[in-house]
Amino acid sequence: MSATKTLEAVARDRVGKGAARAVRRQGQIPAVIYGGNQAPQAIAIDLIRARTLIYAGGFKTTVFEIDAGGKKTRAIPRDYQLDPVSGVPLHVDFLRVVAGQTVTVDVPVHFVNEDQAPGIKQKGGTLNVALHTVSLEVAPDQIPDAIEVDLAGREIGDVIHASDLRLPAGTYTGEPTDTVANLLPPTVLGADVEAEEAAVAEAQSAESAEGKAEAEAEATNEKNKSEA
């Protein structure tokens, strides 16, 4: 599971677009902590720190201890906004973590030992991934960093279902039969190209024969006219 990380913040007295712009001019981004049957708390966090955390991966599955002026709050990111052009973080929403609470999070799926899968290594198959993340409903302090899928021994035609994953009991929000990935046979590109070329050649030959027949028919008609 992900370790709790510390995040320094500053409490904000003012909210709104003007206040948010002022925060960003100071090298920070506005954020809010909500939930837990408490009033929302407006805060500001360092832009560089926020950008590093977001782009490092696993941001929305990490529990943070947010220290805003000595007031510490455990919370988990629920959403964030990025500038559509620059990708710079603009705002973050945090959900308070309280005892007995569960949260729904998307946990990444990592595939390991691909070089030990005969269907891929020896037979040239391809791993077709249907689910890059799985949605879990779990206690915040039990969120796994990632779900590993071992491909060792896998053959072409094998299908990996959600029921094959090692997940905390009762946490998966989908169906056990959901396909996570499967191993596809190699595509024979050369054969496809040859078949296409043969079809083109056949069509061209048919067109040539048709043109020749029309020319012969026209010549015969001209000959008959001259003899008449």
UniProtKB/Swiss-Prot annotation:
CDD domains: Ribosomal_L25_TL5_CTC. Residues 196-228 are annotated as: Disordered. It comes from Methylorubrum extorquens (strain CM4 / NCIMB 13688) (Methylobacterium extorquens). GO terms for cellular component: cytosolic large ribosomal subunit. GO terms for molecular function: 5S rRNA binding; structural constituent of ribosome. Residues 209-228 have a biased composition (Basic and acidic residues). It holds the Pfam family Ribosomal_L25p. Part of the 50S ribosomal subunit; part of the 5S rRNA/L5/L18/L25 subcomplex. Contacts the 5S rRNA. Binds to the 5S rRNA independently of L5 and L18. Keywords: Ribonucleoprotein, Ribosomal protein, RNA-binding, rRNA-binding. This is Large ribosomal subunit protein bL25. This is one of the proteins that binds to the 5S RNA in the ribosome where it forms part of the central protuberance. Belongs to the bacterial ribosomal protein bL25 family. CTC subfamily. One of its GO terms (biological process) is translation.
